[in-house]
């Protein structure tokens, strides 16, 4: 196996985790799929599949969810960058989600600082 093939993840081969975080038990969040693509990321489920576990010094993960599925407000001890690859997403900030709202479309990118409560739909 070549060095590159060990570090390749094809979209159709992504293995989702539907219980990576505690909020997936909340009504409205139960259809979210999380992916740990490079590194273990910030997932709370130790059984989540890590696609590329080779140490890189950074993590890349992903989320996929149907319209109307809410990712409840949360914060991380890491910065988070979102790249919208499909659909429209609304990002909210603040503990209650009412400090700011940003609508994002395909191709838009946002960097969210650590310790900032954020959620998305």
PLM features: what roles do these ranges have?
Residues 41-48, 59-76:
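Conserved short histidine dyad/triad with adjacent acidic residue
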Residues 48-53, 70-76, 93, 101-103, ...:
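Short histidine-centered beta-strand/loop micro-motifs
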Residues 69-72, 90, 109-110, 114-119:
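Histidine-centered metal-chelating micro-motifs
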Residues 55-60, 78-79, 88, 107, ...:
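Extracellular structured ligand-interaction cores
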Residues 62-63, 73-75, 79-84, 102, ...:
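His/acidic/aromatic-lined binding-pocket segments of jelly-roll/cupin-type domains
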Residues 66-67, 77-90, 94-95:
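Glycine- and acidic-residue-biased ligand/ion/polar-headgroup-sensing regions
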């Amino acid at each position: 196996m070549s060095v590159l093939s060990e570090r390749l993840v094809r979209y159709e081969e992504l293995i989702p985790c539907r219980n990576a975080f505690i909020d997936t038990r909340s009504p409205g969040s139960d259809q979210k799929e999380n992916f740990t693509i490079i590194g273990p990321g910030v997932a709370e489920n130790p059984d989540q599949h890590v696609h590329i576990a080779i140490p890189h010094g950074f993590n890349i993960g992903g989320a996929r969810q149907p319209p109307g599925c809410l990712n409840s407000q949360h914060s991380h001890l890491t910065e988070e960058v979102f790249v919208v690859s499909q659909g429209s997403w609304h990002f909210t900030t603040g503990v209650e989600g009412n400090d700011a709202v940003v609508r994002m479309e395909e191709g838009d990118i946002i960097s969210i600082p650590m310790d900032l409560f954020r959620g998305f739909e």
